[in-house]
Curated annotation (Swiss-Prot):
This is Beta-ketoacyl-[acyl-carrier-protein] synthase III. Catalyzes the condensation reaction of fatty acid synthesis by the addition to an acyl acceptor of two carbons from malonyl-ACP. Catalyzes the first condensation reaction which initiates fatty acid synthesis and may therefore play a role in governing the total rate of fatty acid production. Possesses both acetoacetyl-ACP synthase and acetyl transacylase activities. Its substrate specificity determines the biosynthesis of branched-chain and/or straight-chain of fatty acids. One of its GO terms (biological process) is fatty acid biosynthetic process. It is an enzyme of class 2 (transferase).
Amino acid sequence: MKAAITATANYLPPDILSNHDLELMLDTNDEWIRSRTGIGERRILKDPTKATSYMCGEVARQLLEKRQLAATDIELIIVATITPDMPFPATACLVQDLIGAKNAWAFDLNAACSGFLYALNTAIRFVESGAHKKVMVIGADKMSSIIDYTDRATAILFGDGAGGVLVEPAADDSCGVLDVRLYSDGTNGRERLLMTGGGSRYPASHETVDKKMHYIYQDGRQVFKAAVTAMADVATEIMQRNNLTADDVAYLVPHQANQRIIDAIAERMGVDRAKVVSNVGYYGNTTAGTIPICLAELDANNKLKHGDNLVLVSFGAGYTWGGIYVKWQ
């Protein structure tokens, strides 16, 4: 039995943080940001009473409506996030409560920007095994909650947002999720993209707050090089394993980290730029949210048709990375 994506949805907060807004906060300007990242604006969940679970709940309700399902039909909810409402309980459990999915079990998955692909793979295995028939997968992050807005290196990159899919048995074995390749590298990744404060190694204290250890840190140059290589390599591997040429691919859907990274991947793969999905200019890097947000936008604009070959690729902290081949049903 194959598993397929049967519905998509996304949620972007209404408030916009533009490059011009950042000019008032940082030593930067619109041209500098656009030339290095391709980002012009990003969405921010400003309401202090709303957290990641709120965005997930908005996505979950849309998914149910699109498939005309009751919340009680859902058997499993997986939320990929690095910005949970709190360390525990899992944000997925909060989502289960928000939508009334009383028959579902729920858990969070942390693989940073690769989180959605990791979570999607997990859902696929539950469906392929016959254990479940209706699994909800959501990637969401309120990155503004862990960004130091005095740090130009990170403040310009990230935004808030969520996207999700329903995974169900495919209508037939010719469509659905046809291949998955996932990887990790803790040796090279552990010190280059991280947030050190707040865990069991450095519990929250006056010292961790004073040292800004509760904000994200990244070695931008090293992460850039690693991301381009990893995503291009895994996309090529997926294509070779499935005898796909660049002409066969309807859309390459990469993690939306930086337009320069996206362009470099496309160039290395030889894929027509018209087939490379990009919305980073409008939303920035929403971490686990980027790929499902892209899928939902393609779907909403009627750009996905039966039999389309999609290659999804991502790279994130860990390092973690991977690719998934979907033939749209």
